[in-house]
Structure formats: structure tokens, C-alpha cells
Amino acid sequence: MFDINIQSSIRFDVDKVIYFDPIKLDERHDADYIFITHPHYDHFEKETILNLKNDYTKIIGPKDIYEVALEMGFSEDRIMTVMPNETYDLDDMNFKCVPAYNIDKPYHLKEYNWIGYVMEIAGIIYYIAGDTDALLENEDIICEVAMIPIGGTYTMNAREAATFVNKMKPKVVVPYHYGMVVGTEDDFKLFASLVDSSITVQRAYEKK
């Protein structure tokens, strides 16, 4: 259904191939859709996007990506800019963008209008959080699978993420965004130990 190669780089292979924040992937040109949460280098990597892009690929993200997407050869009708707290229809998909920002850190400011995504993929509702702190306004997101950053420094840390997830109550949580820039296997272990037993903790990638 999905795999995460590193950081927050997700690939869904269902009836279409959907990427979120792809980085460090070799040439394959198989993307139907590429969703971007924000333009930082570990989420929006030009080389990888060019490796995934084909003539039919559509790219979706905050307004910051628009000019770069044009430079990469996307036509205007294959670029979709989105905002938090809005719901969108794209082809046969419906998705909501939710806020992703830091409360007391300068790395991801609220006014940047960067985002996470809530989307049904192959009958399962996913929340892909992006780089964010544990926001009160996101605690009531309804999803079956939550993909949550736990690395700290630039996002919520393992303890904050566990508290957030326990309030959200998805069926499954996939902690990610650790092991590349910040965060270690110890953060995964701490997170897993603090998540309610009713929620399944699924590894994003191999031990870091």
C-alpha cells in the first residue's frame, strides 16, 4: 500500500501512484500525483521530483512551490496550489489541507500557510502531518492512519507526538521524520512506549 524510504518521503501504489514529500529517489517517472507539504529541502527536492515526473504528473502544494514547479517543466494546468483549512477536489480525489506550523519555534511559521493532508486512499483515511507541532486545532482530525513527525527540534518531539496521537485516536500511527536530520531510534522507542495500547504503532522505515 505505502512505503516511506526516508524522512517524510511517502509513496502510495494503489490504482494510481501518489507521492508525498518525495526525496532521495532514483529515476522512475511513475508519479501520477506529487503532494508537497512545504518547500524545505528535506520535503521538496527538485532532483527527485524530476526523477518521478512524467508528462501527466500533477503536483500539489502551498503557493511557495509554484514558480519552482514551472521551472521543472510542469504546465500551469498540472500545478495546484492549496491552503490550510480548505477542502479540494482533484480528478476523482477529495482531500483536506490542515495547518502545519510551529507554536514556539521559528522554522515553520503559521503565516507561511504550510500544510498537512487528510485524504482517503484506497478506502483508508490518512493524515499526513507535514512538519508541525502538536496543534490543538488538529486533535479532532478523523483518520484511520496518522503519519506524525517525532524527531523534535523542527517538529513535535516523541513525547508531544504521543500525547497528540492519544487524543486523536487513529487506528494506526506511523511515526516518521527522524533519523535523517534529527531524531533517533530512541525517539521511536519512547513514542511507541507512550502511545495507547488501542493504537497500533507501525514502523515507517528500518531502524536508524
Where are these regions (language model features)?
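Short, Asp-centered acidic motifs that coordinate Mg2+ and/or phosphate
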Residues: 17-18, 33, 145, 172
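Metallo-beta-lactamase
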Residues: 118-184
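Active-site metal-binding motif and surrounding structural segment of the metallo-beta-lactamase
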Residues: 23-68, 142-147
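Redox-cofactor binding/interface segments in oxidoreductases and associated redox assembly factors
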Residues: 35-36, 96-100, 148, 175
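Binuclear metal-ion centers of metallo-dependent hydrolases, dominated by the metallo-beta-lactamase
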Residues: 1-3, 73-88, 139, 162, ...
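Short, acidic/turn-prone active-site loops that include or flank metal/cofactor-
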Residues: 24-25, 39-41, 64-66, 83-87, ...
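Core dinuclear metal-dependent hydrolase active-site scaffold
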Residues: 1-29, 79-142, 156, 204-208
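Active-site regions of enzymes building and remodeling cell-envelope glycoconjugates
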Residues: 31-38, 74-82, 94, 144, ...
